[in-house]
Amino acid sequence: YGEGIAVLAGDALLTLAFELANQARATNRYKQNDFVGELARTAGHAQLIAGQVADLEGEGKPVSRAQLRYIHEHKTSALLTCSVRLGGMLANATPRQLQALTDFGHHVGLAFQVIDDILDVTLSSEQLGKTAGKDAAVQKATYPSIVGLAKSRKIAADLTAMAYAALKPFKGQAVVLEALADYLLK
């Protein structure tokens, strides 16, 4: 469908997210404006937009590992963190539980992005279901291009372990999140 339709689809999904957040029922800990605020902070200038700007500015230029982590923290990781935090807030999570969900989302989001970078250089387009090597073609910084494939795999494994560890306070009651991590990370 092309880039234009993809941008419009993203816009539609974002506005739908705000619509749903606005319709969410308050809990005794979280009010409707908490849900909308969480989404707005994630989609706004300090998170998603900042990460995308850094990503676009880095194309075709040398990017440090710290800059790449910044991009991933403000894009993929921020979106996944927001998703699990909103779920926790809707379930009336305690502050401790919400912090565990925040940690999980952060680590699973970073791990997902590192794994995506690895797959982009190790699998074919047919295996990926999308164009392989696209990042390299536009000289986009990735973990394999900065630290190599072996180190990227180690980083992904460490982040994955941290994501699973973040769920320990739930003592087996986070089966759906564990399944999400299994799906995203394997």
Residue positions per predicted region:
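Mg2+-dependent prenyl diphosphate-binding active-site environment of isoprenoid biosynthetic enzymes
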Residues: 1-168, 175-185
